[in-house]
């Protein structure tokens, strides 16, 4: 298990964060991203996932993450 930090960004400002989330691998981050995205109502927000080293491994717009989380939206 590795620890990952989840952050919601509005511009360059972090408006919400959930640090040190244990995940078995980076693919396990997507359900968490979808859950966070469903709660975001501000336009233009992004969700960033960082490794404990500080390296960004996922950066996605909240709207895109919401669409990804909706199984009725075809790719």
Give the label of every model feature segment.
Residues 17-26:
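Short, contiguous acidic and Ser/Thr-rich linear segments
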Residues 25-41:
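A short, charged, amphipathic alpha-helix used as a generic interaction element across diverse proteins
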Residues 39-75:
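Short, mixed-charge low-complexity intrinsically disordered segments
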Residues 6, 29, 47-49:
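Generic recognition of well-ordered secondary-structure surfaces with a strong bias
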Residues 1-17:
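Short aromatic-glycine-(Arg/Gly/Cys) micro-motifs in beta-strand/loop hairpins
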């Amino acid at each position: 298990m590795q620890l990952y930090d989840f952050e919601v960004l509005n511009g360059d400002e972090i408006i919400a964060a959930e640090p040190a989330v244990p995940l078995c691998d980076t693919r396990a981050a997507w359900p968490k991203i979808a859950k966070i995205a469903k709660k975001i109502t501000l336009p233009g927000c992004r969700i960033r996932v960082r490794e404990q080293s500080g390296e960004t491994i996922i950066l996605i717009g909240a709207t895109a993450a919401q669409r990804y989380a909706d199984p009725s939206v075809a790719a």
